[in-house]
Each structure stands twice: as structure tokens, then as C-alpha cells.
Regions:
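Single conserved hydrophobic/aromatic residue that forms the stacking wall/gate
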Residues: 690, 694-708
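Residues that cap or delimit alpha-helices
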Residues: 258, 270, 688-690, 705
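P-loop NTPase motor module signature
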Residues: 1-432, 513-516, 576
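Second RecA-like catalytic domain
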Residues: 41, 246-247, 252, 296, ...
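A short, sequence-level motif marking secondary-structure junctions
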Residues: 186, 195, 561-565, 708
Length: 708
């Protein structure tokens, strides 16, 4: 079910003696092993009896929950035990370890929690970073903190970085010139097929055609890589419409599925049954799905990318890299000779990037910066990084955390920031939960945070949109199976409730769990969201029901008609960054009076004197602003004369000098001056009547002091 089939000998066995020798010497190490070599589950078991463990535990990081659970189950099964004995795992909302556990498999975010609780990792002898080539933000951060722990507290702590594809030189240098151990060789050969011509037309149609061809000419079950859930659902519907037969099972596999559905997708099938697994990149590494002999790769990947200039994250669909394509190809050769059908040409393959850039370049760094501040590091440059955090993203993250009260002006963590860091949430949501305590809205805040952290509980048909978070809360409070044109995902609702209850338990004891009136709660949704997303408070633009201006100066819109489109003010919790206008995905209305109370200290009064192109006149107003939003304005009774002159000049520049009320006599004078200047040439003593020169003259006049 995980990294390799049960066999008497795997390729990794050949390098285990060298690995044991290096670790016995007390050194860090780097292990590269081809897919299927057996590193994920054989290496931890092979180190169990090493004397340098001295009663301590092995800690292994996996990039995904599914991979962590599967690896733990596989190792426990090899020992003839259940998970929670010698082998256990830890992840958010799910932990199975016991007093006899000696191997802990954890998701990458757990390592930072363990380090914050015990910077020396005193109960662990070694940390293994599996699939490090993925270069996730949490893995990079975990390695930097482990190196700091090793330097300050635990020189005997071993670090082992494991990967299938990795540029070894920089990693070896970071680990103190750590030896590199290479394990070559795949278990079984894989035939690779390319398209003759570049793919044209709809992706889902091409994928279904490739599946039908493979069912007809190849043996075994199929693993199909698709960029996201939307494509998985479309392909699944098309396959179901084909009535492929009772011996063909179709199994989606992605990170938002319940654990039971994920387990079904990777479980063995009955004899005579073939399975078609429709997966995202979740199946790319650390998993062996029993029976898979064919891989069909669409060659695409959907990734979140954070723009520090806008503070927004957008989802982008990108081409896979060569190392990622090789990982996917390897899924077909785990159990027997296999086939990999790539939906691109061999020429296109040569143009693919060798590997993806580290997540550090594309991530929101606010959680990282808060984690480092809790560690005691105000400046990320103080740590040893394989890839240092980009300065622009660090500056944006520091600005956000300072605004939320998590950091002081020197970048050091505050008491409020320490409380935020204790909650396993994005700093925005942690701030919302803590601030909800004095407002007596903790139950609602926990539900909101859970809704925003888990998958959407509503599933609509293609093109369906309803961004209102209040609708989801109403569904969560009731037992509806259908809401607003969408079906209700009951398993997602259960997970949201469980997550909300967990966070309620982690809040300070004075948190009020009153059973508030549900209608009153729904009216407070926008207020709570404004605590988490002050930069995304949005004001509807006049004359347009779909477009909003956010407090950060960015624009946002509803891609399709939405019930929220008539609200004067929204707080946008989730949006796709886009280019000029971001698409609103989740939001709630907020009352202006709540904003004026909540951010009274942030509202500025600005006097503005500007030229109005529409009215062709100077407008002088006093405005109350929240960021880029004009909450109210009124006319100025006594505007500054110099500002009026400047505004008039702006109007003249835009409309041109001909817009002025020239008399016939003045027009004749301009013509005579122009004639004389043309006769005398460049050295003429007569002024240039061109608009640019006259504008300049007017500007000089506007700077002259007015008479008393």
C-alpha cells in the first residue's frame, strides 16, 4: 500500500551497510534512491537496532497525510503489528503512537510543533526527511530548524535527507559536507509512450480516449494523473457514462477526500477486477497502489502561487517538470513491468523544466515568519537555508503580522503572537479566534476557521457559484442535503464540526461557548472575517454589482452573478489572485457601523482637492478612509487656494489650453505671437504658445505667493 511491494530483497538493501556506517560515525547523510527502491519503509526499519539510538525514537517526515499513514501501516505490517506499536504516526487531528513506539511517521508541519515544544528534540535520535526533492516550505523550514537545534543543543542528532531526484551538491554542503549514498535501479522496466502530435482539444476527452485504448491493449489497473478535482470529476462522469462494466472500478484520489475514500483508492482489488485511479499529484511519491501497471499522465499540475505585491494567492495550472514526470512514470513499474502513456510529444518532453522551484518562492510566508519569531529568530537570514526566503515575501508577511499584533516594530513576537502560534492555523485565522473571545463569538469563529481550512462543504454543478459563507454556516447548523443549487458533502461537514470543536478546546479557558441565536451569529460573520482579512474589506463600486475595491487597493469581482453582488461592503475570505481583477470565491457582508467600530483607529480623515473630469470642475472634499476605501465624504467649505490652483492645472493639462474661455482678442494675440516667433526662429524673444510651455508657465505662476 506504500513505497514498495513485499519482496525478499529490494534495491535499497545494497546500500544499507554504507548508510549504517555513516550514521554510526555520527554524521548527517543524503540518500538518493530511484522510485521503487524501498527507501521509505525499509530504511527506518533497518535502523531500529542501531546502538546510537540509545533508546530514542526515529522521526520520519512525509509530505502528505496519505503517504504518512500508508508508510506507517506498511512498516507495522512488516513487523506483524498494528499501527501504534513499534511504528506510529502523528498528524493534525489524527495521532496513533504508544509507549512502545520507536518509529514516528509525521506530516511535515508536525516537526515545527515538536521543535517549539522541545528545541533539543531530546526524545529523538534521528530525523529522516523523505521525498525532500519536493522542496515544500515546511520541509525546508524543518531542516533549517533541525540544523539550528543540532548546532545549539544536539550535536549527536542525526539528519538523513532522502529523495528520488535531487541536486545533491547544495544539500550535502548544507548538511556539513554530508556523504551522498546513491541507490540505482528500478524494480521493473516501464515502456514510455508519447503522442505523435501535440495535444489539441479538451483535456478530459483526450484522457478518456487514452484510458479506453489502454483498457483494450494493456493489462492491469490504471493510474491517471490529472491537475485537480475539477478534471477528476469530469473524467469520472465521462467514464461512468461509458458503462465500462462491473469489473472496472473507478476511484478518485485527492487530498480533499475522506480517509476512507483514499484508502479504497489504494487498496487491492478483487481478482478479475481492474481499477482506474483518477489522481492528483498526491499519488506521485511514497505510494504504491496495488495492481497498477499503467500510468496515464496528463502532464499538468495545479499549484497555489502567492504574490507578495498583492498579498493574494492564485491557483495556476502548470506543466509538470521532468523529475515529476519521472516520478509518475515510476508508479507503473513498482509491481511488474508497466506502461506509461504521456499525453505530450517527445519533443515537448525535452522542453520541460528539469525540476520545480522550491515552494519558498511561491508561498505566503506569514506562517513561516510567525514560526521563526516564536523560535526567537526575527530575521530569517540568521538560519541556514537551502533556499533563503525571498525578501519581498518576507516584508509582506512581516507587515501582515505586525498589523495583526503578532509582531512588534522590531519583528519580535508579542504575547498575542505567542498565543496565535499555539493554534495550528494560518495567523489570520488564529488572530480571529483569539479576538473572538472578548466578543463572545468563539463558537462562530471556530466554525468559520474550520470552514476556511477544510474543503468546501457544498458541491455545485459546473458553473455554479455562491460565495456566501453564511449559506455554509446555515448548512452546518442544519441537516440539509441540498442548498442553493448545490449538494451538501456530509463527510466534509463532519470534519468541519470536528475541527471546530478541537479549536474551541484550544482557546483560552475564558472562551465563551454560549449557544447564541443563529440569526445573530450570521450577522456577525462579516465582523469576524474583518479581523482576519482587514486588507480584504471590500466596497462595491458605484453602478456595478459585480466589482469591488478592497482596502489594499486591489480589485475583485464575481465571475458569475452571485447573491452577494448587491452588498455595499464585503469581507473576502478566499479569492483567486488573477491579474487585474481577482475572482471572489468566499465572502460575507459586513456592516459599515461594525467597520467603523472595529477599525476606528485605522480610519483616516483626508482633505482632497482634485479636478473632476466628468463635471469639468474642481471638487474639494473631506473623506473618511479605511485603506483605499472611501467610507464617507463631504464638501470642504474653505479649501486651500494653492490646492485649488494645482487642481485647475491638472484639469488644464488633461483638457488642453483650448478648453479655457479664450476671447477673440486673446486668440488674435496668440496668433500674432506665434507668427512673430516663427519669423524670428529659435532665438525669438516671444514666448512659445505651445500647450506644454504655457502649462509650465502657469505652474510657475501657481507657486507665486498670493497677495495678503
Amino acid at each position: 500500500m506504500t513505497d514498495e511491494p513485499i519482496m525478499s530483497r529490494l534495491p535499497i538493501e545494497d546500500v544499507l551497510p554504507a548508510l549504517r556506517r555513516i550514521l554510526t560515525e555520527g554524521r548527517n547523510a543524503l540518500l538518493t534512491a530511484a522510485p521503487g527502491a524501498g527507501k521509505t519503509t525499509r530504511v527506518p526499519l533497518a535502523l531500529l537496532d542501531e546502538p546510537w539510538l540509545d533508546g530514542k525514537t526515529l522521526l520520519m517526515l512525509e509530505p502528505r497525510r496519505l503517504a504518512a499513514r500508508a508508510a506507517a501501516h506498511r512498516m507495522a505490517s512488516t513487523l506483524g503489528e498494528s499501527v501504534g506499536g513499534t511504528v506510529g504516526y502523528r498528524m493534525r487531528l489524527d495521532t496513533k503512537v504508544g509507549p512502545k513506539t520507536r518509529i514516528e511517521v509525521v506530516t511535515e508541519g508536525i516537526l515545527a510543533r515538536l521543535l517549539q515544544q522541545d528545541p533539543a528534540l531530546s526524545t529523538y535520535a534521528i530525523v529522516l526527511f523523505d521525498e525532500f526533492h519536493e522542496r515544500s516550505l515546511q520541509a525546508d523550514t524543518g531542516l533549517a530548524l533541525c540544523l539550528e537545534s543540532q548546532r545549539l543543543f544536539r550535536p549527536d542528532l542525526r539528519l538523513l535527507v532522502m529523495s528520488a531526484t535531487l541536486d545533491c551538491g547544495p544539500v550535502s554542503d548544507l548538511l556539513g559536507q554530508a556523504p551522498v549514498i546513491a541507490c540505482d535501479g528500478r524494480l521493473f522496466p516501464v515502456e514510455t509512450r508519447y503522442l505523435d502530435q501535440p495535444l489539441s482539444g479538451h483535456l478530459d476527452v483526450a484522457v478518456v480516449q487514452a484510458i479506453r485504448r489502454s483498457l483494450a491493449q494493456d493489462q492491469g489497473s490504471l493510474l491517471v494523473f490529472l491537475p485537480g478535482m475539477a478534471e477528476i470529476r469530469r473524467v469520472e462522469r465521462k467514464l461512468l457514462d461509458l458503462n465500462l462494466g462491473s469489473n472496472i472500478l473507478i476511484a478518485p484520489l485527492h487530498g480533499d477526500l475522506p480517509q476512507e475514500a483514499q484508502d479504497r483508492a489504494i487498496a487491492p482489488t478483487q481478482p478479475g477486477t481492474r481499477k482506474i485511479v483518477l489522481a492528483t499529484s498526491i499519488a506521485e511519491t511514497s505510494l504504491t497502489i496495488d495492481g497498477i501497471r499503467v500510468v496515464i499522465d496528463a502532464g499538468l499540475l495545479r499549484v497555489p502561487r502567492f504574490d507578495p505585491r498583492s498579498g493574494l494567492t492564485r491557483l495556476e495550472t502548470i506543466r509538470v517538470t521532468q523529475d515529476s514526470a519521472e516520478q509518475r512514470r515510476g508508479r507503473a513499474g513498482r509491481l511488474e513491468p508497466g506502461v506509461c502513456s504521456r499525453l505530450w510529444t517527445s519533443a515537448e518532453h525535452q522542453s520541460l523544466a528539469p525540476r520545480r522551484p522550491p515552494e519558498m518562492f511561491d508561498a505566503d510566508l506569514a506562517p513561516l515568519l510567525l514560526e521563526l519569531a516564536l523560535w526567537g529568530t526575527a530575521n530569517p537570514a540568521e538560519l541556514s537555508w537551502l533556499t533563503p526566503p525571498p525578501a519581498g515575501a518576507v516584508a509582506q508577511a512581516r507587515e501582515l503580522l505586525t498589523g495583526l499584533g503578532a509582531l512588534n516594530a522590531e519583528g519580535q513576537i508579542t504575547a498575542h503572537g505567542r498565543q496565535m502560534a499555539e493554534l495550528p492555523l494560518h495567523p489570520r485565522l488564529a488572530h480571529m479566534l483569539l479576538t473572538s473571545v472578548p466578543l463572545q463569538l468563539t463558537s462562530l469563529a471556530c466554525e468559520l476557521a474550520a470552514l476556511l481550512s477544510e474543503r468546501d462543504i457544498l458541491r455545485g454543478p459546473s458553473g455554479w457559484r455562491n460565495a456566501d459563507l453564511r449559506l455554509r454556516l446555515d448548512v452546518l447548523h442544519g441537516e440539509h442535503d441540498y442548498a442553493g443549487g448545490a449538494t451538501v458533502d456530509r463527510s466534509a461537514c463532519q470534519r468541519v464540526r470536528r475541527t471546530a470543536d478541537l479549536w474551541q478546546q484550544q482557546l483560552p479557558k475564558q472562551a465563551n461557548k454560549r449557544q447564541a441565536d443563529k440569526q445573530e451569529d450570521l450577522q456577525s460573520v462579516g465582523l469576524l472575517l474583518a479581523l482576519a482579512y482587514p486588507d480584504r474589506i471590500a466596497q462595491r463600486q458605484q453602478g456595478n454589482d459585480a466589482r469591488y475595491l478592497m482596502a489594499n487597493g486591489r480589485g475583485a469581482l464575481f465571475a458569475n452573478p452571485d447573491p452577494l453582488g448587491s452588498e455595499d461592503y464585503l469581507v473576502i475570505a478566499d479569492l483567486d489572485g488573477g491579474t487585474q481583477w481577482a475572482r471572489i470565491d468566499l465572502a460575507a457582508p459586513v456592516w459599515l457601523r461594525d467597520l467603523e467600530t472595529l477599525y476606528a483607529d485605522k480610519i483616516q480623515v483626508v482633505d482632497e482637492v482634485l479636478w473632476d473630469d466628468t463635471a469639468q470642475m474642481v471638487r474639494a472634499t473631506s473623506q473618511r478612509r479605511l485603506g483605499s476605501l472611501i467610507l464617507s465624504e463631504q464638501g470642504l467649505s474653505k479649501p486651500d487656494p494653492s490646492q485649488i490652483a494645482t487642481a485647475l492645472l491638472q484639469g488644464i493639462r488633461r483638457a488642453g489650453l483650448d478648453r479655457l474661455a479664450w476671447t477673440p482678442e486673446l486668440r488674435q494675440w496668440r496668433a500674432r505671437v506665434a507668427f512673430l516667433r516663427r519669423i524670428e526662429g529659435q532665438e525669438s524673444r516671444w514666448p512659445d504658445r505651445k500647450s506644454t510651455r504655457l502649462n509650465s508657465s502657469h505652474e510657475r505662476l501657481s507657486r507665486m505667493p498670493s497677495s495678503a
